[in-house]
């Protein structure tokens, strides 16, 4: 029986490259030169931003988003936290979300059921397995999922026939 998995994954190597590109862009910008920094924690997928003022943090977030887009990483996975003061500096965290949580998985399964396709969807940890009798049914399910916005980038992998 044909099946595929719906996942939400980040390419960690591309993510590292995007942050490095953002650091280079920060050094190139005359208005931000020497006034801010990016610190990427690969373990917990967090980028710590430090600057002298709030408006500089906003500019740095835009630089980071632009670098992510250039590296073909969907910006929807970026969750920007509130900025806070730390001495004379302003700090802000940007967390990159990966994986499908239970709430999003339920939305995906519900959307597939609403579409009344001849497929079954089952939640398996941080992914959703979709099975059907025909490959065409699976392609319709993929089209239905791509048409709806879930707030997270979705990838389809592990096709089995």
Swiss-Prot record:
Classification via NCBIfam families: PRK05412.1
Question: What's one GO MF term for it?
Answer: nucleotide binding
Q: PANTHER family, alphabetically?
A: UPF0234 PROTEIN YAJQ
InterPro entries hit by this protein: DUF520, UPF0234-like_C, UPF0234_N, YajQ-like_sf
Against CDD domains, the record matches this protein to: YajQ_like
Q: Which organism is it from?
A: Pseudomonas fluorescens (strain Pf0-1)
Q: In its UniProt entry, what is this protein called?
A: Nucleotide-binding protein Pfl01_4421
The role this protein plays is: Nucleotide-binding protein.
Is Nucleotide-binding among this UniProt entry's keywords? yes
């Amino acid at each position: 029986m044909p099946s595929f998995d719906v996942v939400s994954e980040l390419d960690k190597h591309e993510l590292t490259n995007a942050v490095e590109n953002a650091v280079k862009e920060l050094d190139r910008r005359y208005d931000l030169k020497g006034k801010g920094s990016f610190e990427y924690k690969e373990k917990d997928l967090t980028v710590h931003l430090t600057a002298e003022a709030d408006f500089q943090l906003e500019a740095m977030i835009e630089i980071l988003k632009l670098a992510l887009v250039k590296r073909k990483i969907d910006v929807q996975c970026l969750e920007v936290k509130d900025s806070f003061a730390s001495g004379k500096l302003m700090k802000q965290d940007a967390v990159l979300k990966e994986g499908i949580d239970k709430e999003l998985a339920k939305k995906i399964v519900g959307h597939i059921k609403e579409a009344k396709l001849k497929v079954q969807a089952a939640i398996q940890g941080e992914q959703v397995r979709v099975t059907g009798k025909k490959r065409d049914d699976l392609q319709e399910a993929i089209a239905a999922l791509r048409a709806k916005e879930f707030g997270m980038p979705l990838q389809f992998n592990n096709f089995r026939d």
